[in-house]
Amino acid sequence: MKRLLLCLAGVPGLYADAYTERVQAVTSTPGLVAFWDFTKREAPGGRFTAHVPPGAKHDYALDAGNYVKDLWGQGPAASYADFPLLGAGPFGEAIRIKAETNPDFRPLLFVPRARLHDTPLDIKGAGQAVTVVVWAIRESGNHALAGIWHEGTDLKEKSTETIAKVERGQRQYALFAGLNKEGAACGHVSENGASSFLNKYALHKCNSAEASPKVPADADPASLAKSWRTFAMTFDSRTRELTGWLDGASGDRWLENPQKDRLLSFAANAWLQGRLAKIPGLQEGEDPKFPADQYYNPPEETPVKVTVLEEVLAEGRARREELREYRYTKVKVTLVDDRETGRELVALRLNPWWFPHDLYTPKADGTGGPFTIGRVIHSSRGVGFTGWIGGVAVFNRALGAAELAQLHALATAPLPAPAAK
């Protein structure tokens, strides 16, 4: 690997050919909206810009900012100097997201809302699909990698007591480094920009089956070269499936006993409330004030698997319990004389996750969120993901497994940085 890097660095023509081939592998993938490789800039030393389709009007230059300074009025300004360069990466360069120790300093790279609203990057509304791919080395953390995901600063928390600008959540789509499953590829989407299932947070998210390991960001070059992972999320608006992918593989992930989960217990309750609302009359456990648009009831018409848990014949009546596995849920069903008398949620599928809505469409008043890389606007102001990011790509359709595997193959042999940026 090291020999390959040295050879390419010493022969400009070979480097240019390898770099061009890799960029074309991304830009020729149908549906590309923007691709930042951290090599392409406005000018040497200028802002990073995106590769975009021919004829596109926007190159989505990335600004540097500290969202704590912008919204709390605290902390120093951020600059490109706060994102050290590795000098190598899947496309020749990578930026470092550091574990900042100053709680008033949370730097990120971003495209302001004013420059992206109603452009192809502003993926939203009926029938719209999205894929986000991030080539990264994860040092620590489980939070945001890239996307339009302004979490809002209107939550009543200790961290927001000194907020200078109170703003509602403006979430659309984003890719995270795991969240509830640290190190996984976690796709996150929202239909309302705000919260889900009466919880204060957005909870429509998926997690790849596999998770990325932690790798020290200051590891030796050979170790870093072997540590690139390809995080991805897809939302297919036709199937309503949100899927997390790590290194081109999605895998199956379920959450058993979701009622006991700190956050997804709210999704379990949304399933219950939606089921009870369909039964005439007020049922035990039913909340008549639960908003109908927050019910969570994936299709449960035809099970993919049925396991009989118990069969009993008593007092002339046949009682049977079945575990029915549907595509997105597992449900324990009780039947008496073949008539359903009870239904209990046993598990929720986390990958893929069923999302029955359209992506949030912000108002055209400037309040929508920016597209950010490395962090998102976050009321708790946590450090989040740390490590190296060597590329970010956004597509306006759900890429397939073969396409994502091809994009991951680009990370297996990193390139050195070009001689002049």
Feature names for model-found ranges:
Residues 137, 227-243:
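Localized edge beta-strand/strand-to-loop motifs within extracellular or lumenal beta-rich domains
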Residues 1-7:
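Sec-dependent signal peptide recognition
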Residues 15-110, 159, 166-169, 255, ...:
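Extracytoplasmic low-complexity segments
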Residues 38-45, 139-142, 238, 249, ...:
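Acidic glycine-/aspartate-rich tracts in secreted/extracellular proteins
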Residues 146-205, 263-274:
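Glycan-recognition/cleft segments
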